Design a protein with these regions (language model features):
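Short, glycine-rich nucleotide/cofactor-binding loops
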Residues: 1-7
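Histidine-anchored nucleotide/phosphate-binding helix
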Residues: 9-19
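Reductase modules of NAD(P)H-dependent flavoproteins
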Residues: 24-135
């Protein structure tokens, strides 16, 4: 699960899987506000020829008419729940904005039965996050 530039650590995982010949079942969900936020979409699609066992689900939350987006829409962490409502027996690697990572962790463990110890995350803090008032 990647949101925006949180794809960078996920890309490293994909490269490792390819290098080591790992073919275990995995699905890549990558979300952005606009299609241009999926800045390495072409690279991902090229890798799919080498990793045919890896489904790729790009999800856009705020596409504009001029984007001509015809793919999945909504929040990327919600797309996972729609496709995989039971995550027991799975592992999740989530990277991106804290709100996405935190929302995914909460939903997957509370609703989709993901064991908390199977949720691995690397969230990044933006300038906007740094200026928020702590609750």
């Amino acid at each position: 699960l990647a949101s925006g530039t949180g794809f960078a650590p996920i890309k490293a995982l994909l490269e490792y899987m390819l290098h080591k010949g790992i073919t275990r079942p995995a699905v890549l969900y990558w979300g952005g506000r606009r299609p241009a936020d999926l800045y390495l979409d072409g690279w991902v699609r090229e890798q799919l020829t080498l990793m045919p066992h890896l489904p790729y689900v790009p999800v856009i939350s705020d596409a504009l008419a001029q984007d001509n987006w015809t793919g999945r829409t909504g929040f990327v962490h919600s797309a996972v729940l729609q496709d995989l409502p039971d995550l027991s027996g799975h592992q999740v690697y989530a990277c991106g904005a804290p709100v996405v990572v935190d929302s995914a962790r909460a939903a997957y463990t509370a609703v989709a039965h993901l064991p908390p110890e199977e949720f691995y995350a690397d969230s990044f803090t933006t300038e906007a996050d740094k200026h928020k008032d702590p609750a």
